[in-house]
Amino acid sequence: MFVDRSSPMVASAISTSKLPRIALLALLVGFICPGILSRDFWGSSELSAFSTILSMVNGTGIDWALPNDLGVNEYADTPLMLWCGAAFVKLFGWLLGTEVAARLAILFFYTFTTGFIWYGTWYFARRDEAQPVALAFGKSASPRAYGRVVGDNALLLFIGTLGLFIPLRELDSEIALICVTAAYTFGLGWALWHPKWGSLATGAAIGAAILASDLWLGLILLVAAIYIHCRAHAFIPQPLMPRLVCLILAASTVFFVWPIAGVAFTIELVDAWWLGWWQHQIALIDLPSSKDITWMLKNGFWFVWPVGPFMLGCLYAFRKQIGRTHIKLPLMVLGALAVWALFVRNPNEGILMAFIPPATILAGFGMMAARRSWSSLLDWFSSSVFSLIILALWLYYIAWHIGMPPKMYHSVYKLAPMLTPTFHGFWVGVCFATTLAWIAVMMWRLNHAKSIAWRGPWLAAAGVSAIAIIAVGLFGNLIDANRSMKPVADRILADFKANQGTAQCINADELDNAQIIYLRHWGLPLEKAQCEFKLVQTARVEQGSEVIGYYNRPRDRHGFILLKK
């Protein structure tokens, strides 16, 4: 039946039918917008990053070049994401508000990440050695259509990755890190077609890796890129030195903008700051431990679902052609990231996020090579599990408002006991329309031909996006009350004003600088000076002080105490 069996993939013209671009764009927007434009900050890492962004916005060039919180140097929050957040606050803070403007950095990195993943996959899939077998009967997919559908699959699987559901919406350095690894993989794919431009893009990603993560990731990616350019057979016919010069020049230029800016703004402080930065980099690395490896293996499986299984399926399908460029290069990127992850002290979700872009490229090919039973498994999982989750969200929302059934009501009530359920007609309408759209997708799934290659990833991405919209739309204020510090700050401010008298400030000696900055932003007059009132974060109450109130989020074991001397 086939003319050639040199590839494990088969793709007909019908199976590579074009996914409507409007539908894809709507899905990308629908996935990321919930939790970006209408929420408070949910985690301590977001609050820490936001406090540093506020220091930049309200400070001078020194605060931009050498990130700090009230003069205390900040090394954990990497500058790339902070610069973008502060820049958006400067540009749009007057229009959107400081919090929303800062979160535009998430939208910025998300846009580039999705673009890098799609175009990186496109460049790998367009190569002759990546093409599927030619059909003896029937029309085979054209290289352009095949590259497009593999790119769509990779991008849809990225959107449908369960582990990215929350981290991809948080104002944290990991959102810049995942963009950098996507750009790095894209640069390698682009270099196959445009050697100099691709090498420049790869080098820029290496320099940005230091700004988005740490020095060691940048060095490992640099060594990996040099090795790939020297040894990968696809690059051998091309002149080596121009590519290496472009690679190293771009990496050096992007990184050294930072220290040069530090010297330009404050040569007096730069030595001490960079010494602290270097000590922080040394503290980041450690020898691999069985505990860390076990943690990554245990959490990695669910974090990368459904990308992981299809990536492994791709490697199995190409086990006899593992040296092909479209498989070998993303796999080598994963290997470089694995070396970095092994030596990082206390790995976390951010480490796992870095693996997603090259893994999605392999998973995109894996979808094309998968048997129909495996593709149907993704269909079944998306259709059944996501439909049940959407149904459960509506049932819990109704129970929260009517108080029945009692068990469901109390499950929601205990998340924010002080919050009174309110009905927001606009958001309920949006969620209802989203539910109808999901039902329409399910009907399309039941009635549509099974031969379209992007059907399974489309269902996964659409299901995750629908859940995001419905969860935030129905329970946005509940999530804010449970996870945000703003309601806590509002209660402290209300009690302070009720008991203020002639007092003008609240002593904050026992709070860290990040807490002081974001609580000040929400109106609390915190000072590190003698004040009649004092805000502490401890279970011990000072003698001779009157307790005005206790304040904490429902999820916190310990909160704040406002004292009056």
Regions found by a protein language model. Give the residues of each.
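Start-transfer (signal-anchor) and selected internal transmembrane alpha helices
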Residues: M1-C33, P242-A251
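Transmembrane-lumen/periplasm boundary regions of multi-pass, lipid-linked membrane glycan transferases
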Residues: S48-G59, A204-L329, V333-E349, I361, ...
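Extracytosolic helix-loop segments that constitute the early lumenal/periplasmic catalytic or substrate-binding loops
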Residues: A49-N73, L80, A87-K90
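Membrane-interface transmembrane helices that cradle and orient dolichyl/undecaprenyl
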Residues: A145, V149, Y184-A201, I206-A209, ...
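Short acidic/glycine- and proline-prone juxtamembrane loop motifs at membrane-interface regions
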Residues: G163-L177, L217
